[in-house]
Amino acid sequence: MSRNYGAKVITMCMGLSLCLQVPVTALAASPEFARTTEAWAKLRDNVLEYDELEDLIHEYNPTVQNNIETYNKTMKGVDYDDYSRQYLLQAEEYDREAGDATDDVSTITAELSAAQARNKAAIDEKDGITVSWENELAEKKLVQQAQSTMNSYYQLQQQLKAAEKSRELTEANVNATKNRQTVQMATQADVLAAQQSLEDADAQILSLTNQIETTRKKLITMTGWKQDAVPEIKAMPEVDLARLAAFNPAADLAKAQENDYTLKIDTRQAANVTNGSNQKIYAQNVANDTQQIGVALNTAYQSVQQAKAAYDEAALNLEVSQRSMNKASVQYQVGSISRLEYLQAESGFVSAQTGLEVKRLALLQAMENYSWIVKGVRS
């Protein structure tokens, strides 16, 4: 695995030839004893798998590593009272300055500073637990983003496959149009229009190819590889219909509320603040969070149902296209249809195949979005 930062050689080199064979891996966020040898080997190979994304993000994502380092240096073990006490002491010092001031400007300045310090103690500073939750939420959102990026990568692959088959049909149509022109059954304008369609098809293929590469680089860099690395990216998992059938917004709501990071953070800050007006603000935030969790869960559930319906429709479309393809194959073999007509049927079949796969991936993504809300992560 070619990692992006903090490289270290994990075995001793015995001679130059042996050194050249030693894998170089990035420093992970966790100590070596945190995982088994087999688990580390799986993460350090040159293969990216969907079910590894969460662990890869945790160990090798630079944002996560930076958050962990910062937390360990500045916030670990720090509670709200530590910060509150610090700023309240500052407020008391400003109060003394205000009492000792000999002019109105100095008095007002000191009183303002005291008020700001009390406000800082009441609302701005966060304790270690709050920051820890924020870091966990940020990490989980990165995992969610990685899942979505990998899903998009494979959806784009399917779109490219369909575009390439469509281009083959378009090119055949250009040749057929030129042949018709030779027998005065097509005009020069018809030929130019067909050629323009071919140029458009080439432009679409180029655009999709670039999008695929951009998406690939985004995926591998956020999981620890260098931008120019070429790890094997394994296929996406199948849709688990049993998991889908178990989705139940009414039953899942309590768990989603219990896990929701934003709700936990706002609830803790509401308990920490002492200023009456700020307490009202945080209490309202908590109430809003509670309501929004239910809305988000129901919206995500509806998206899952819509994605499932679209997938089922695409499956039926593929069955129809398969029958048309079978018929066209027989007709082409006996010479009853032209090559262009055969390519039309073939292009339609490939479009139906890739369309079904895109809908499957969209369903998988919708299911993941629902599950993330249950796990406490809202967009």
Predicted feature locations:
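Short, solvent-exposed, mixed-charge loop/turn linkers that connect secondary-structure elements
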Residues: 209-251, 367-379
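Extended, charged, solvent-exposed helical/coil segments
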Residues: 257, 276-286
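Sec-dependent N-terminal signal peptides of Gram-positive bacterial secreted proteins and lipoproteins
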Residues: 1-28
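Coiled-coil heptad-register positions
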Residues: 68, 75, 82, 89, ...
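Bacterial Sec-pathway N-terminal export signals of envelope proteins
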Residues: 26-129, 133, 140-146, 150, ...
